[in-house]
Every structure is written in C-alpha cells, then in structure tokens.
Amino acid sequence: RPSSVPDRTARNPTTATAPLAFFERAVAFGAEHDILIAHDAAYSENTFDGYRAPSILQVDGAAEVAVEFFSLSKAFNMTGWRVGFVAGNASALKALSLVKDNTDNGTLRAVQCAAAKALDAADTLLPAVNAVYQKRRDLVCNALADAGWPTAKPQATIYVWAPVPEKFRGDSGAFAEALLDQAGVVVTP
C-alpha cells in the first residue's frame, strides 16, 4: 500500500487547475487511508484573470495528512536558483529535513537572502511577474487563434497547450518537424 500520494495543481506543465473541493476529497482520502498527500504547488502563484489557486493547507485537517511544496522559480523569476519551501505535516517535514541535511549542503546564502527579499515584496512582485506571463499567454493564444488553431487560455502556470492538428494526430514527431521546418518554431513532440 502506498505511504504517500503526489498531486500537482496548477499542474506542471498541463495548466489544469483544481477547486478547493478537490483538496477536501484528497485530505479526506489521506486521513481515511493514513496516507500522506504531497502537493506540488510550484506554479500556484502564477495565476491569471482573477483566478487564485487554492492551497491544500486551506482544508481543515490538512496539516495532519499533507505537505505542500512551493518554488520561487517562476513566481519570482528565480529559475535555476533552486529555492523553495515546504509546509504541512510536522513529522513529514522532520523526516524531509533529515534527508535534506544528509544529501546536500543547502542553498547558497545569497540565494536565501534574495528569496527572503522576494517573499517580503510578494504583494508587489507577483502581480508584475504575472502580468508579463499573462501578456505572453495572451500573445501565444491569440496568435494560435488567428492561425486557425484556437486554444483555451489557461488560468495558471506559464504553459499553453494546443491540440496537435488533425493531419498530424498519431505522429506528434512529424508535427514537431513540420513546425520547425515551415515556421522555425520548436516544440516538444
């Protein structure tokens, strides 16, 4: 039987979001089966159009059965600095701390100081960063729609997903090659 269940919303990289009711069910499941729920909330702060991603830790009882991982990479333009934090179940955090203490030397102090400054300025920084991401999202989605390839505008994350055109269904590699050859655009098949 599993000892933990991972979950990701806003999903990296699918852009899917979940309502608080989803987390309520996850917490109830974790409590019923004595399973730790590990929620990857790396993109939870990158939201658009008034949407705010809920936290699993908003749910009553979540601190007993869940941990939530956060990253400053995209929300604060700190990609590559590998800085984040985790909150939730105290015994899980203690175990994670023990593992972390014995597997690496921690995060460079300068990066920790930059992260602290970013978090202190979150009310100013996050709207500015998200405005840039939203503008990029809108440019991509509008350009795709103008090309006859409409896509849904995601409420969260930095990704845009578009269906592979009908003539390339079943061969995303051929589509990626055609897009590179004909438009100079690189995508992952």
Language model features by range: what are they?
Residues 1-189:
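PLP-dependent class I/II
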